[in-house]
């Protein structure tokens, strides 16, 4: 089945597919997901010469852009998303960076790349939009796609800390089967089971947790 024909229903989509592309980007910015957020998410991670990165659920490209800002010209970044609107928005800004950038329509649990293809796999505020089974399959794919010693950057909401955003988001985060993984922070365990070991764990703001894992080997 080709990418264009693949049925992504049930895979999950930001804002349940109501908003996408530029509308999504503007609304997300109102909630603090701007350049500064994505730069903090990337932190000191970077690609070396010829390095390759994959952005799962890339949306309009904010996390990919933050990494591209500090990447050499011969590095490459691939963003994957199931929303054509998001991908179109991401592609519009890709030409501003020296490194290679590609944005393709693909689901994070079924990716068209060989084993050990990437030095870095990353995702920001995307896993919680997918069903639990898709999340687990996406982490399995991440472990498959990373080179030994490669890095997995996972940024998503977690149990809120004290602070304004924590107070605002608490009622939305606390209940529901879809939210349970994030509330209970099951990702370190899921990653460890797949050979990805936790190296960094902190918060970007009151609800956005940043975790860095390294693949064994």
Model-derived regions, located:
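Short glycine-dipeptide loop
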Residues: 50, 73, 146-151
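A short SAM/SAH-binding and catalytic strip from SAM-dependent methyltransferases
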Residues: 120-133
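C-terminal alpha-helical "lid/dimerization" subdomain adjacent to the S-adenosyl-L-methionine
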Residues: 7, 31, 153-194, 198-210
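A short acidic, Gly/Pro-enriched loop at the edge of an enzyme's catalytic core
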Residues: 109-120
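N-terminal, positively charged/glycine-rich alpha-helical extensions of SAM-dependent methyltransferases
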Residues: 1-22
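A short glycine-rich, Lys/Arg-flanked "PGG" loop and its adjoining helix->strand segment in the class I
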Residues: 136-148
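Conserved SAM-binding loop and adjacent beta-strand
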Residues: 23-40
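Class I SAM-dependent methyltransferase SAM/SAH-binding core
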Residues: 54, 59-110
């Amino acid at each position: 089945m080709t990418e264009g024909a693949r049925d992504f229903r049930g895979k999950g989509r930001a804002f349940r597919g109501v908003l996408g592309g530029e509308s999504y980007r503007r609304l997300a910015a109102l909630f603090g997901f701007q350049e500064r957020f994505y730069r903090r998410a990337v932190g000191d991670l970077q690609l070396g010469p010829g390095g390759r990165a994959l952005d799962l659920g890339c949306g309009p490209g904010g996390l990919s852009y933050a990494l591209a800002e500090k990447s050499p010209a011969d590095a490459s970044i691939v963003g994957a998303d199931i929303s054509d609107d998001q991908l179109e928005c991401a592609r519009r800004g890709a030409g501003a960076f020296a490194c290679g950038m590609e944005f393709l329509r693909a689901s994070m649990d079924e990716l068209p790349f060989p084993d050990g293809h990437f030095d870095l796999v990353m995702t920001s505020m995307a896993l919680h939009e997918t069903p639990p089974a898709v999340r687990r399959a996406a982490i399995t794919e991440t472990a498959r796609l990373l080179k030994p010693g490669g890095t997995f950057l996972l940024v998503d909401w977690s149990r809120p800390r004290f602070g304004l955003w924590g107070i605002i988001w608490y009622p939305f985060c606390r209940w529901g089967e879809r939210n349970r993984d994030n509330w209970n922070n099951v990702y370190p365990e899921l990653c460890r089971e797949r050979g990805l070991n936790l190296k960094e764990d902190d918060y970007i703001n009151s609800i956005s947790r940043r975790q860095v894992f390294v693949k064994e080997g």
